[in-house]
Amino acid sequence: VEIPVAESLGVSRTPVRLAFRALEQEGLLEKAGKRGYVVRRFSEADVRSAIEVRGTLEGLAARHLAERGMTDAVRETLAGCIAEGAAVLAKGFLVDEDIGRWGRLNKRFHDALVDAQDSRVIADAIARNNHLPFASADSLALDRAALPSEYQKLRIAQLQHQLVFDALTQRESARVE
């Protein structure tokens, strides 16, 4: 596997081998005996677990942030994301462009929360987990054919963002977690 990849990229086997090892450590590739690597299969349960792990780690990050307190810049970023989310939902329905917009604002919200807390260990664990399929905050599994029901999901997510922001503002660490 290394040789064809190296040839197609015009590089030696060494960087390809190192990249494959890194992808294996991230859980995206698995060793296939002496034949190299195969792409790891992920079940629906794996995806659910990865999302649950992200939620738990982000809850811990939010607790740390609530205990320490938010800077004005973090407060403004989170409030801006909430305002943008409200604007997306204000018309009472979704269009295709709203999905990408929501994904970007959701990523900004979650990234701001994680970046502002004080634990590099938590941030690193979240970053590793985010490499798994559909685990990151910008991975939205929305059904474009059922936008009315997806609208309701985003309304709930918007409410959750508001509740997290309120708890952070009031420095209620147990509530935010």
Predicted regions and their residues:
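Surface-exposed charged/polar residues within alpha-helices that form helix-capping/stabilizing sites
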Residues: 49, 63, 115, 165-166
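Amphipathic, non-transmembrane alpha-helical scaffold segments
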Residues: 51-54, 102-106, 154
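Amphipathic alpha-helical repeat elements characteristic of tetratricopeptide repeat
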Residues: 55, 79, 155-159
